[in-house]
A protein has these predicted regions:
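Catalytic subdomain that performs nucleotidyl-dependent activation
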Residues: 81, 118-122, 126, 139-214
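Short hydrophobic/aromatic-enriched beta-strand-loop microsegments
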Residues: 58-60, 164, 242
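Generic alpha-helical structural context detector
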Residues: 97, 156, 178-181, 220, ...
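Peripheral terminal appendages
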Residues: 1-36, 42, 46-50, 54, ...
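ATP-dependent adenylation/nucleotidyltransferase module used to activate substrates
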Residues: 1-152, 231
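Residue-level marker of structural boundaries
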Residues: 56, 104-105, 160, 185, ...
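Predominant activation on well-ordered alpha-helical scaffold segments within soluble catalytic domains
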Residues: 23, 48, 52, 77, ...
Length: 266
């Protein structure tokens, strides 16, 4: 976990462990197979390909027309067709419009948080579709979140975080890129700028305010129990940026936990 540089032997072991995990999870749920939201990005492509190796997988491609880049739709469909993964493409515009209308009926303005509120609605709409397919066809929902995103809370609670299992949730983003190359995924998937596609022109690194390479280095050191001062000194990264990452990790812990239960019995 503490090394960001993996050998081919490491990657082979990781692939086996993840595919075994997927297989066992499907069997434990007495499910027919799995479903995964395929965005055209590296995380979902890696998960889809690993799952397809060992299970009956259906991919859902869920663009918002006018927001999701056509390139992403093309990449997602190309990955599915190239590797023979059955898929369904569903435009989510009407669903989002309905949910936004409901928000209006509740007389909620959103204020300065409007962009984030709408983005969360989109992520939760996709979650609803994932589970509609999963429930109808007796599948489990595969999440595509990686360790980097999970640690800093870069996902929507009960949105893209609403899944049954997280096959790559133990891998930092840096690891995911290495695994993608090991699996021989196309360069156009590996080299594209990561984006959640929640608004026009959105990119992960711009929203996070830090490059994934630096973010992963900080997270690895935090996982080792290093202090902010030690990390700042050893990595040569601005202290304010290290503190920002540290605070995000603390503030997003609730996203990784089940809701607290009030204890009423002695």
């Amino acid at each position: 976990m503490y090394s960001l540089s993996l050998t081919d032997e490491d990657l082979g072991t990781i692939k086996r462990k993840i595919t075994d995990f997927i297989t066992n999870s499907i069997e434990d749920a007495a499910a027919k197979g799995a479903t995964v939201a395929l965005s055209g990005g590296v995380d979902s492509s890696v998960v889809a390909l690993l799952a397809h190796d060992v299970a009956d997988v259906k991919a859902l491609i869920l663009p918002e027309l006018g927001v999701t880049p056509q390139e992403d739709i093309f990449h997602a469909t190309t990955i599915a067709e190239t590797y023979g993964i059955p898929y369904k493409l569903v435009k989510i515009n009407d669903i989002i419009n309905c949910l936004n209308t409901a928000k209006g009926l509740l007389e909620l303005s959103g204020g300065e948080n409007q962009k984030v509120i709408v983005a969360n609605i989109k992520a939760r709409a996709r979650m609803i579709l994932n589970y509609t397919v999963a429930n109808t066809e007796n599948r489990i929902v595969l999440g595509t979140g990686n360790r980097t995103e999970l640690r800093v809370g870069y996902f929507t609670k009960y949105g893209d975080g609403g899944v049954d299992i997280l096959p790559i949730g133990n891998l930092y983003k840096t690891h995911v890129y290495q695994l993608a190359a090991y699996l021989a995924l196309p360069d156009y998937i590996i080299r594209k700028a990561p984006s959640a596609g929640l608004w026009v022109g959105q990119t992960d690194e711009e929203e996070l305010g830090i490059r994934y390479t630096d973010l992963d280095k900080i997270l690895v050191e935090l996982d080792k129990g290093r202090s902010v001062d030690q990390i700042t000194r050893d990595l040569g990264i601005n202290k304010s940026k290290v503190i920002e990452v540290y605070n995000r990790v603390l503030q997003s812990k609730h996203k990784l936990e089940m809701p607290p239960i009030a204890q009423v019995w002695d």
